């Protein structure tokens, strides 16, 4: 789960990470009061969406007067913004962050993530802040520093000092780097964070470090023990279908193809999509109904798939271990009848009660294509999708 910048900075403040003075508004009527709370020679008006690269897309505006601030806020609030990180989709701007301006001397990059290779929390630091870190890593890998935190002892003071020395920090900023890194690490542990990022972390003319931007991603699997963070969720920034799927305990990710997929198990779902691609097709989604699939959840899964007008055929691939194939068949029949399905459905069932499941499908009177194996199912669903295109 992603947080907005203003939410992330609120967490930063709780952990002693310095941020600019700022006020979030979601109504233009609150703008004057917000400006009055920020003693600054100018302001920054920042669109709040779940994406980076907002500045390049016109979502961050530097203003010097209240009139300019009002114009910028009027243009942004209530509109939508697409960046290079939104895959062509414009996200709604329902809130703005109004911040003070700073005299910036130098910009750094700082992030903390879970490294699956070393199985540690890992800091990534660079003196080349304010840029896409991927581009820096590609063009100048020597500018990227990393620090792996041993989970048995935690972040050590000497590791913070090494980074401060490497960045050439002195005085107040040198000491601040240690507190920022310690705050980062504790925040990640306390809040089940999968990614923390400041880009840029700026060194001001007063030799102080300030988090000019903030990005926080929370491990969605841990939200059950983070009720305070759940309240920060902004569904308007999410794909409507993915949000609805989560409400029904379905794992759904929208893709760009025309072949809908319904599978139980993430690994089997990925293998199914691979075979569709191998046969020349394009999956329209990833959808894992899970091991405890019920007829009701299967029906909801069908509705999710069909919510995309691009879908021209559907492949249902179920291996009945925990879930019984006859129950899946009931769900398929129920869903087809409920939604009045008009596109081809290819079904591959294997496992517990598979014979009974196939009998139910055969006796349903519905136009459902059965397959004898996964390879056969992939071939058939791609073929019927191609026919629908002609």
From Swiss-Prot:
Which reaction equations make up its catalytic activity?
Answer: succinate + ATP + CoA = succinyl-CoA + ADP + phosphate; GTP + succinate + CoA = succinyl-CoA + GDP + phosphate
Residues involved in ATP binding: 46, 99, 102, 107
Q: Which residues bind substrate?
A: 264, 321-323
**Which EC class is the enzyme in?**
ligase
Tell me one Pfam family matched here.
Ligase_CoA
Any one cellular-component term (Gene Ontology): cytosol
Cofactor detail note: Binds 1 Mg(2+) ion per subunit.
Enzyme Commission number: 6.2.1.5
Where does the ATP-grasp domain start and stop, copy by copy? 9-244
Entry's Gene Ontology BP terms: succinyl-CoA metabolic process; tricarboxylic acid cycle
The transmembrane residues are none
Coiled-coil stretches: none
Q: In which pathway does it act?
A: Carbohydrate metabolism; tricarboxylic acid cycle; succinate from succinyl-CoA (ligase route): step 1/1
Question: Could you tell me the keywords of this UniProt record?
Answer: ATP-binding, Ligase, Magnesium, Metal-binding, Nucleotide-binding, Tricarboxylic acid cycle
Keyword Disulfide bond annotated: no
Keyword Electron transport in annotation:
no
Which GO molecular function, any one, fits this protein according to its record? succinate-CoA ligase (GDP-forming) activity
Provide the residue positions that the database annotates as binding Mg(2+).
199, 213
Q: Which InterPro entries does this entry report, sorted A to Z?
A: ATP-grasp, ATP-grasp_succ-CoA_synth-type, ATP_grasp_subdomain_1, Succ-CoA_synthase_bsu_CS, SUCC_ACL_C, Succ_CoA_ligase-like_bsu, Succinyl-CoA_synth-like
* Cofactors (names): Mg(2+)
Q: How does it assemble?
A: Heterotetramer of two alpha and two beta subunits.
Per the similarity annotation, which family is this? Answer: Belongs to the succinate/malate CoA ligase beta subunit family.
Q: What does this protein do?
A: Succinyl-CoA synthetase functions in the citric acid cycle (TCA), coupling the hydrolysis of succinyl-CoA to the synthesis of either ATP or GTP and thus represents the only step of substrate-level phosphorylation in the TCA. The beta subunit provides nucleotide specificity of the enzyme and binds the substrate succinate, while the binding sites for coenzyme A and phosphate are found in the alpha subunit.
Q: What is this protein called?
A: Succinate--CoA ligase [ADP-forming] subunit beta
Q: Which organism is it from?
A: Hydrogenovibrio crunogenus (strain DSM 25203 / XCL-2) (Thiomicrospira crunogena)
